[in-house]
């Protein structure tokens, strides 16, 4: 099968891109041809198909809109990429005409490529499968968050709530643009052209169905990770570990506050420590003279693996509807118990008392109580083994591949 893989970045910057390159390799290992469509960036992995890529908003050095100079051209690009880009439609139709894919598999496109990738593919008669990594179809700011708490007012009171509260980046302009684009897409009925939706979690699938999406078009296929037997043996480490984005919705401040109350225990926080939230938390730690919370910064490769191996357990303290984070699967891979917030998809990953513990989001005191439950080495080993078993049972690469191929074959036959 020849598959056109669409994502607005062709380099690893987060979970969706890790998935993109992992699924690309898996499909190719199984004899399929995978062809990318993306946006030019100086960070991109090299590919002969970059000649079909479109120019970014701003410069090829910028990853985020905030890094771009706000020239009239950049603002116009931002508007068209948010609403509908004829430039992108023309580019993807050109690539489809030349490479003749059997289907298009879309990972991320919002605000960078626009849903013209969907329309362009359908105009060329090619079926479209869309994987959802967040809540962009339902929430203007993608994460159902307002004022550090889950918020679904746009679903119950309408999208004017977003404009009133300036939910998108705290900006009236950005909020108006995002709401307007969602209304345009709804009026155009763009998502009717999607032949199948893939969700990583049952939680996201349920949200879509509750809000009018066709249940028959939605399949939950959890993210996968490779099962490495040489790193899967349970080891009892000496510290708690948070690894991932250090941003407000990830709830890292709950970890800091909990360990402030547990000065005899040690926690490491691994992730980009230059974010606004990381700077705020590091300043708090310095002000309060907290000695047992260690920021490691971003780590990768063998260094990342060794830090996870050395952990006693890992922490996922999210305060948003986290949508099957890769960090959970990586924890399972290394046979680590996970202490996670009882929110979003996390209860699908952590069975309380079996492979970890759940606690009330943002409740530092309850987090302390759950950490204390893992003082017993035997419990840590048992729960770590349960994490590994869950990985191999539900998140194995072959399971993901088999389910995905059933979807691909079904949309081809339509």
Description of each model-found segment:
Residues 366, 379-394, 400-406:
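A short, well-ordered alpha-helix in the C-terminal region of glycosyltransferases
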Residues 137, 156-230:
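Donor nucleotide-sugar binding/catalytic pocket of nucleotide-sugar-dependent glycosyltransferases
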Residues 1-49, 124-127, 260:
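N-terminal subdomain of nucleotide-sugar transferases
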Residues 279-302:
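Nucleotide-activated donor-binding/catalytic signature segment of Leloir-type glycosyltransferases, i.e.
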Residues 352-353, 357-364, 371-378:
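Conserved acidic donor-binding segment of nucleotide-sugar-dependent glycosyltransferases
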Residues 309-323, 336:
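Acidic donor-binding loop of glycosyltransferase active sites
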